[in-house]
Amino acid sequence: MARINYSVKEDPETTSKAMGSELHISPKKSREVCCKIKGMKVPEARKFLEDVIALKQAVPFKRHHDGSGHRKGPMAAGRYPVSASKEILKILRNAESNAEYKGLEPANMYITHAAIQRGRVIRGFMPRARGRATPKDTETVNIEMILSEVR
């Protein structure tokens, strides 16, 4: 596996970082979730992700929204990406524990950077009738998150 670096440089004394590598979730859905939580305070983002997992709060889809219906609130199309939200919540909790280890207060921090990059594609084949096969590929995602103190 290749070494993955963070795409932005931040001050190490006032920030906390966490990363998830080659997660088996949809890149499109994880992009929409990361766009929504970027700029939120940490407790607010944690509550939002927990509500998405419980199907109480929808994530607005700006780019990949064909066939999505309108949802309550200030959004047009929205969905409930549960598996992507679970993985991003794990990364957020990891960044919170990294902040506590550094002596920072996670309740007073906000998400300055939440980005995804597509990871490698895991090739697979599903056998079909008469000796044929259909490709069944699994996409992976690399997610990076940086928390900063509120100034």
UniProtKB/Swiss-Prot annotation:
<comment type="subunit">
    <text>Part of the 50S ribosomal subunit.</text>
</comment>
<dbReference type="GO" id="GO:0002181">
    <property type="term" value="P:cytoplasmic translation"/>
</dbReference>
<keyword id="KW-0689">Ribosomal protein</keyword>
<dbReference type="GO" id="GO:0003735">
    <property type="term" value="F:structural constituent of ribosome"/>
</dbReference>
<dbReference type="InterPro" id="IPR001063">
    <property type="entry name" value="Ribosomal_uL22"/>
</dbReference>
<keyword id="KW-0687">Ribonucleoprotein</keyword>
<keyword id="KW-0699">rRNA-binding</keyword>
<dbReference type="GO" id="GO:0022625">
    <property type="term" value="C:cytosolic large ribosomal subunit"/>
</dbReference>
<keyword id="KW-0694">RNA-binding</keyword>
<dbReference type="GO" id="GO:0019843">
    <property type="term" value="F:rRNA binding"/>
</dbReference>
<dbReference type="Pfam" id="PF00237">
    <property type="entry name" value="Ribosomal_L22"/>
</dbReference>
<dbReference type="InterPro" id="IPR036394">
    <property type="entry name" value="Ribosomal_uL22_sf"/>
</dbReference>
<comment type="function">
    <text>This protein binds specifically to 23S rRNA. It makes multiple contacts with different domains of the 23S rRNA in the assembled 50S subunit and ribosome.</text>
</comment>
<comment type="function">
    <text>The globular domain of the protein is located near the polypeptide exit tunnel on the outside of the subunit, while an extended beta-hairpin is found that lines the wall of the exit tunnel in the center of the 70S ribosome.</text>
</comment>
<feature type="region of interest" description="Disordered">
    <location>
        <begin position="1"/>
        <end position="25"/>
    </location>
</feature>
<dbReference type="InterPro" id="IPR005721">
    <property type="entry name" value="Ribosomal_uL22_euk/arc"/>
</dbReference>
<dbReference type="InterPro" id="IPR018260">
    <property type="entry name" value="Ribosomal_uL22_CS"/>
</dbReference>
<comment type="similarity">
    <text>Belongs to the universal ribosomal protein uL22 family.</text>
</comment>
<protein>
    <recommendedName>
        <fullName>Large ribosomal subunit protein uL22</fullName>
    </recommendedName>
</protein>
